[in-house]
Amino acid sequence: EKDFALVEDALVKEDMFEKRNRLYSSLSGGEKQRVLLARALAQEPTLLLLDEPTNHLDIKYQLDLLSIVKNLQINVLAVLHDIQLACRYSNYLYLMKEGEIVYQGTPKETITPESLQAVYGVQSQVTWTEDQQAMIHYL
């Protein structure tokens, strides 16, 4: 009974409860992504590992999913290629190049024109909003 309640709660969080009776193969890529997250959440993990969890998701669902994950009260290690989303939803970042961590720290400490040049080979200007969101302008 508890397991059913956990699954139901996870599906509701991911806005997938109404599609619970559909075959997995009939879901869109984004819906499949949300079901997989719901499945992981139903296991009540203490550590959640996510590899590109926002792939195939519309912007609204990217924001919804990352907001849910941030509010879980568990440790999350997520691989994200969208720097601005990573800054918005992370307390701590690792920037990697060729499999090595080359920068780490808070988003504001980590995301700088120098780090973006070193890791991605791009020139940029980075400014921060009052609510600590990165605004990156690539030159």
Give each language-model segment a name.
Residues 113-139:
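ABC ATPase nucleotide-binding domains
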